[in-house]
Design a protein with these regions (language model features):
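Conserved G1/Walker A P-loop phosphate-binding module
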Residues: 1-49
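Conserved nucleotide-binding/hydrolysis micro-motifs of P-loop NTPases
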Residues: 22-23, 81-83, 106-108, 142-146, ...
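Switch I (G2) and immediately adjacent beta-strands of P-loop GTPase domains
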Residues: 43-84
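Amphipathic helical hotspot of TIR/SEFIR-family domains
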Residues: 108-130
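Canonical P-loop GTPase G-domain recognition
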Residues: 137, 143-197
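Low-complexity, Pro/Ser/Thr/Gly/Ala-rich intrinsically disordered linkers and tails that serve as
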Residues: 198-249
Length: 249
């Protein structure tokens, strides 16, 4: 769930990387954290479980600018891929504002991809959410492998929500940042619609940076009409002087 800190002028969004075990979720986050400027990222935290890890850190991308005059911060999370860590996946998924589903492009991994995708739908359903209303990006990872399925075939089998898709080789960084940037833009666009916040010139919407859009200044009231001229008073005539007194006898 989006958190808006008006005191810090900051918007916090949670993005979750979902997918089967060893599909490349952890690699995606490690690449982003390694290449992001030190001033724009928090500490990479890892919670180790047997055979898998949950990673998370804060990331403030420069290229997305501000929304409603506020900085945007994204909290990036991965979930453990193994089926027996479903309780952890549910916990990490709570409050998510968008999801990157990382699929393994190898044909022998298709069943695991579909099982994990169905699990994502079920866990969101328990929270009263669906992927049709949540920002979703699909990443076809491991495109460098010789047996990788064609993107069209992956799309036909997995993309029933018509989500944006990206090809990737996460170990080399290829496709990692375009995937993240697209999801971040989708989340901010949804935020604009729900909260009426509009982004600056570098934001997802490219609209005015003030909340609710720029307002035109009110037109100045016309000046009051001048007062009517005062009526002229007739000039006063001084009375004639009194006659002189008569001479004495």
């Amino acid at each position: 769930m989006v958190q808006i800190n008006f005191a810090k002028r900051e918007i916090n969004c949670k993005l979750v990387y979902y997918g089967p075990g060893l599909s490349g979720k952890t690699t995606n986050l490690e690449v982003v954290h390694k290449k992001a400027p030190a001033s724009k990222k928090g500490e990479l935290t890892s919670i180790a479980t047997e055979g898998d890890r949950t990673l998370f850190f804060d990331y403030m991308p420069l290229e997305l600018g501000k929304v409603g005059g506020m900085n945007t911060k994204f909290q990036l999370y991965t979930v453990p891929g193994q089926v027996y860590y479903n309780a952890t996946r549910k916990l990490v998924l709570q409050g998510a504002d968008g999801v990157v589903f990382v699929a393994d492009s190898q044909p022998e991994k298709m069943d695991e991809n579909l099982e994990s995708f169905n699990n994502l739908e079920e866990n969101l359903k328990e929270q009263g959410l669906t992927l049709s209303e949540m920002p979703l990006v699909l990443q076809w990872n491991k495109r460098d492998l010789p047996t990788a399925l064609p993107p069209d075939e992956l799309d036909a089998k997995m993309n029933k929500y018509n989500a944006p898709t990206f090809e990737a080789v996460a170990v080399t960084g290829e496709g990692v940042f375009p995937t993240l940037k697209k999801l971040a833009q989708m989340v901010l666009e949804k935020l604009n619609k729900e909260y009426g916040l509009q982004g600056g010139s570098k934001g997802a919407s490219g609209a005015s940076s003030r909340p609710g859009g720029a307002k035109k200044p009110a037109a100045a009231a016309p000046p009051p009409p001048p007062p009517p001229p005062a009526a002229k008073q007739p000039a006063k005539v001084a009375p004639p002087p009194p006659p002189p007194p008569p001479p004495p006898p």
